[in-house]
Amino acid sequence: DIRNSDYNIKRNWYYNNPNETSLYGRKCNITEQTWFSTKSLFPALTKFFYGREENLSLTGSYKDRMKFRLSETYLLLAEAYLGMDDTQRAADAVNEVRGRAGATMIDAGAMTMDFLLDERIRELVGEESRRFTLVRTNKLIDRVKAHNTTIKDKITQRDLLWPIPQAIIDSNRDVEFPQNPGYN
């Protein structure tokens, strides 16, 4: 699966200051004491790297940004088919995406909402608003409890919606505009 390749996810870091001749080009060992916190070294997505050899810290770009991708459309189609209990057509839609990524094909028996959500994150990591997807599929609370040890005991149904800013509520003078449940 090319989506997990070393090119697409940067896992290794190298010293790139040519003035530091003893370190230049050497792989950073994240257990070393360095000038930065080792907590800041983690796998990074290269799909948003815009640096150039002459300016590796380039943060801005005129590169076009994607709003919609064909793979996202196929994954939404698979979600719709799952909603109709048509796992074969859902698997066919997912396999369009997996084929492009060089991943193995799946069969209808493996097609579940959890598998589809995992496929979405493999394909759309860094692009989609994951929270909205998990709320839409009614999986936010289950996924947080399973994977987020920090807040797994704190998340509730209230957290599916965000509070409406008081200024918005106050600006609706001609109608009653209630706050979302749990935020009163």
Where do the PLM segments sit?
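A generic helix-loop boundary/linker signal
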Residues: 60-61, 87, 93, 105-107
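Short arginine-rich
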Residues: 102
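Residue-level detector of solvent-exposed, low-hydrophobicity positions
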Residues: 14, 20, 31, 42-43, ...
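Extended, hydrophobic/aromatic-rich amphipathic alpha-helical segments that build helical scaffolds
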Residues: 1, 5-6, 65-99, 113-123
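Flexible, polar/acidic helix-loop-strand segments at domain edges
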Residues: 1-69
